[in-house]
Amino acid sequence: IKFIIIIFEYWSFWMKNFCIITNSYKDEKNSIANKISDYIIKKGGSCVVLNNVDTATGQYRVILEEQVPGNLECVITIGGDGTLLHAAKDLEKLDVIFIGVNKGTLGFLAEISPEEMEGSIDRLLNDRFNVESRMMLCGQVIRNNEVVYKSNVLNDIVIHRGGDMAISNFDVYVNGQLLGKFQADGIILSTPTGSTAYNLSAGGPVARPDSHMIILTPICPHSIGTRSILLSRNDEIE
């Protein structure tokens, strides 16, 4: 599964139909979203604005595919990396491009500032951009031979001991064969895009974001010699 992020160079592609997903806690009264939407419409494009935070409860609101236009080509997120990650997860089945406007703290993914957005929109409308594909992971929770939860993620899948103070034991299998036994607080399975997130904090390597691999990194392992392991994107890990 691929996530598509935009880099402003050159690509032969026509872009007119947009959806803006904004975090109202970081974009007060949707002021940035409305400004960008007005600019897109002024330039001849179409745009809808959606909010992914329930202002009454402060909880994240899932964006449904039915809420976005059928001819959608580009999703613009306003917030931080989390806003973009949520949008990519919600709309991962759609063949669209994602671009992030940073109103958060880190901005690894949402790296365009609000001040740069009009120039970026001009590049989109005039076919001066490049598209970079990003792989995603599919995770399942299986209980009694039944899949009880399934989700696709852009950054990482984390298996953690939770509130238990004792160290946990993890038997990791790859394609049905035992890879190793780990004593640790948890296991991170990261994409190259997620390699700069929790994986990096846990001592894992940084990978090129457009590469294709899975990075397995133990969290606080009880062994000096335990290190991250690089796996194929096609491997099935249990």
Named regions from a protein language model:
Residues 1-14:
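Short, Lys/Arg-enriched N-terminal segments with co-localized hydrophobic residues
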Residues 46, 95-97:
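Proline-centered loop/turn at the N-terminus of a beta-strand
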Residues 177-184, 188-225:
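Gly/Ser/Thr-rich active-site loops/lids in small-molecule metabolic enzymes
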Residues 81-83, 104-106, 193-195:
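Short glycine-rich anion-binding loops that position phosphate/pyrophosphate groups of nucleotides
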